[in-house]
Curated annotation (Swiss-Prot):
Protein name according to UniProt: Subtilisin-like protease Glyma18g48580
Alphabetical keyword list: Hydrolase, Protease, Secreted, Serine protease, Signal
Compartment(s) where it occurs, according to its Swiss-Prot or TrEMBL record: Secreted
Boundaries of every PA domain copy: 401-489
UniProt source species: Glycine max
Length: 789
């Protein structure tokens, strides 16, 4: 395998610096998506149906161009299976003309999405309870199909071994395997575990120029897609570790699931870009292939407008997925801790935040005989040898700014000052900060202390740096009089300064850390700016220092100049990593309850989540060590062993979502287009607050009481549930009736929740409470989030 990787690296390395052989040649033309709702040809289209749909797209665009042939040349994707629309290279004026067509729901630019980049399953409790565990009850996700839309897959990873697997489930309608074999390999790239792999790059090439044909493959050259897919559905692999830490058995949440890879994210430099037209094509194909769960570990890096729920590719794709009984799970984003930054917020998307687990990759720093614990994957220095510390700002080149040197940006450090020392740099990125180490190494440093900024809080990341590095919590800068050179940073009583002596211990793995989970400071936060009545994120899952399978082609650090290749596993962080944890859990529930809807699976995971850590105290926020709230973790931290048998669920149908869109003020013609072009009449009696969501959010309360309705479906044995509430500060909550009795599975009961703000409630400030139904065995919890106008 090693020689094959080396050969592949030699073959492709020249292209990695000169990949885009042809520039984009379309002048002012850009890639637009023309969205037209759903097809009327039904869930199992024939080849004639597909041809007819594509012809209708040619006809529509041809009416604008005055030429059907020109329309064929302009269209790069015809979404002809389940999503109705096409992607085409258009002038702005042409896009505006198409938008006037009454059959068109929306026309929008194909957006650039960014990636939201072992022990975790033990931390989630899957190993503890034998026959009562979610793994046992969910048969390890057996024959559930998880589709991953990402950077592709490294098929040779043992995480995708099909040893012991039977025939591929008959529900699978895919089978295409667009992965080139490694040089000299006779092994099939897809098998009974990895049952399909496709790639989509037309929109990427439209924006950036054509890729070399050697790169036209679903093979993962980045590592992100392999990591996320193995986290969701990877097989058991003993002896998984990276840089001699984290030794254990790697596995996914649904280790016996079948998996499929859809490559839409492309990059020769980190991070990869995923263009919306490619994403939509992949989702349309995944629906048609017959997946049960779709994992999407990326999103836009900005908040779209309130009108944009149907100008966002992931939102559109997820809507069509749920209409075919497929759950789409997406990452919340890495733009925290700023409020209102959460991505992927449509109510039909399952949105996942990131938090820590109880394992650390740790290294001790001894600074002037004071011990400081930090995070590290790799320290290759003699543990008893002391090195001199230099602050990066004291080693800056004359032409470098103070800020650039503080962040150890490229070309800022003076080699004559840094050589042979430990350099202290300030961490710039919220997720990945490997470039700082490259600058320090280039300048001759022996190691680096990477000090968090306040925005990073106390989320410590063990990253695959290019040399010995330890990440430490933020240390306040010591003020200096004007004109005095800054030579120290740190706590006022004990600042670090140039000339201090430093020792670094070897990196080691520590288990049973407390408290855990803690909300990652980078995890994007609510409130939901697009649909304020829907709490987002939905839940949190492990997303810090996650060890999983990796592309053996990619460098450990993802830096092109990093020649360390051949890693079977790597440690990454981000909501990209927490997202597939939820997808893996969803796979278990789908195997256990194959008839459940996506909303029921989502409800089960949400209503059984916890807001307590492993010390039985409220979950903290790593940003400032205060208590986290529902805008950080949604309903709480996932608990798969409880989600597998939740007692009650809040179910939703396509009609419920259409009524929600009616109440949200969307055009009735648009709603009919989403309803497979069948007329849908908005009754006018629905409120956005009445969507049967497992959480309750009321963002515009006055002093007058507000009544909302919820319906629960019994999925457990006959029992009587009683309600309890924890009212938000300044508000009262009443539930009618206070008890619900169920005599059979599938029985539905409706209750009302009356919420009233008092004059003591603070205006324009969110407060938090919850509602719980319990029968003595199950606890079905819904967070309540309220704000007085």
């Amino acid at each position: 395998m090693g020689s094959s990787i080396f050969c592949l690296h030699l073959i492709l390395s020249s292209f990695f610096l000169f990949t885009f052989l042809l520039a984009a040649v379309n002048g002012s033309k850009k890639c637009y998506i023309v969205y037209m709702g759903a097809h009327s040809h039904g869930p199992s289209p024939t080849s004639a149906d597909l041809e007819l749909a594509t012809d209708s797209h040619y006809d529509l665009l041809g009416s604008i161009f005055g030429s059907r042939e020109k329309a064929k040349e302009a269209i790069i994707y015809s979404y002809n299976r389940h999503i109705n629309g096409f992607a085409a290279l258009l002038e702005e004026e042409e896009a505006a003309d198409i938008a006037k067509n009454p059959n068109v729901v929306s026309v929008f630019l194909s957006k650039e999405h960014k990636l939201h980049t072992t022990r975790s399953w033990e931390f989630l409790g899957l190993h503890r309870r034998g026959q009562n565990s979610a793994w046992q009850k969910g048969r390890f996700g057996e024959n559930t199909i998880i589709g991953n839309i990402d950077t592709g897959v490294w098929p040779e990873s043992q995480s995708f071994s099909d040893k012991g697997y039977g025939t591929v489930p008959s529900k699978w309608r895919g089978g295409l395997c667009q992965i080139n074999k490694l040089p000299g390999s006779m092994k099939n790239t897809c098998n009974r575990k990895l049952i399909g792999a496709r790639y989509y790059n037309k929109a990427f090439e439209a924006h950036n120029g054509q890729l070399d044909p050697l790169l036209h493959t679903a093979r993962d050259f980045v590592g992100h897609g392999t990591h996320t897919l193995s986290t969701a559905g990877g097989n058991f692999v003993p002896g998984a570790r990276v840089f001699a830490v984290g030794n254990g058995t790697a596995k996914g949440g649904s280790p016996r699931a079948r998996v499929a890879a859809y490559k839409v994210c492309w990059s020769l430099t980190d991070p990869a870009s995923c263009y919306g037209a490619d994403v939509l094509a992949a989702i349309d194909q995944a629906i048609d292939d017959g997946v049960d769960v779709i994992n999407v570990s990326f999103g836009v890096s900005y908040v779209v407008t309130a009108e944009g729920i149907f100008t966002d590719e992931i939102s559109i794709g997820a809507f069509h997925a749920i209409s075919k009984n497929i759950l789409l799970v997406a990452s919340a984003g890495n733009d925290g801790p700023t409020p209102g930054t959460v991505a992927n917020v449509a109510p039909w998307v399952f949105t996942i935040a990131a938090s820590t687990l109880d394992r650390d990759f740790s290294s001790n720093l001894t600074i002037n005989n004071q011990l400081i614990e930090g995070a590290s994957l790799f320290v290759n220095l003699p543990p008893n040898q002391a090195f001199s510390l230099i602050l990066s700002t004291d080693a800056k080149l004359a032409n470098a700014t103070f800020r650039d040197a503080q962040l150890c940006r490229r070309g800022t450090l003076d080699r004559t000052k840094v050589n042979g020392k430990i350099v202290l740099c300030t961490r710039e990125g919220k997720i990945k900060s490997v470039a700082e180490g490259l600058e320090a190494l280039t300048a001759g440093a022996r190691g680096m202390i990477l000090n968090n900024q306040m925005q990073n809080g106390k989320t410590l990341s063990a990253e695959p740096h290019v040399f010995s590095t330890v990440n430490t919590p933020p240390r306040r800068a010591k003020s200096r009089p004007h004109g005095v050179k800054t030579t120290a940073i740190g706590d006022e009583d004990d600042p670090l300064k140039t000339g201090d002596t430093i020792k670094m211990s070897r990196a080691r793995t520590l288990f049973g850390r407390k408290p855990a989970p803690v909300m990652a400071s980078f995890s994007s936060r609510g409130p939901n700016k697009i649909q304020p009545s829907i709490l987002k994120p939905d839940v949190t899952a492990p997303g810090v220092n996650i060890l999983a399978a990796y592309s053996e082609f990619a460098s450990a650090s993802s830096l092109l100049v990093d020649n360390r290749r051949g890693f079977k596993f790597n440690v990454l962080q981000g909501t990209s990593m927490s997202c597939p944890h939820a997808s893996g859990i969803a796979g278990l529930l789908k195997t256990r309850h194959p008839s459940w809807s996506p909303a029921a699976i989502k409800s089960a995971i949400m209503t059984t989540a916890t807001t307590l850590d492993n010390t039985n105290r409220p979950i903290q926020d790593a940003f400032d060590k205060t208590l986290a709230d529902a805008f950080a973790y949604g309903s709480g931290h996932v608990r798969p062993d409880l989600a597998i048998e939740p007692g009650l669920v809040y179910d939703l149908s396509l009609t419920d979502y259409l009524n929600f869109l009616c109440a949200s003020g969307y055009d009735q013609q648009l709603i009919s287009a989403l309803n497979f072009n069948r007329t849908f009449i908005c009754s006018g009696s629905h409120s956005v607050n009445d969507l049967n969501y497992p959480s309750i959010t009321l963002p515009n309360l006055r002093l007058k009481p507000v009544t909302i309705a919820r319906t629960v479906t019994n999925v457990g044995p006959p029992s009587t549930y009683t309600v309890s509430t924890r009212s938000p500060n300044g508000y009262s909550i009443a539930v009618v009736p206070p008890s619900l009795t169920f005599t059979k599975i599938g029985e539905r009961k409706t209750f009302k929740v009356i919420v009233q703000a008092s004059s003591a409630a603070t205006r324009r400030k969110y407060e938090f409470g919850d509602l719980r139904w319990t029968d003595g065995k199950h606890i079905v919890r819904s967070p309540i989030t309220v704000k007085r106008r």
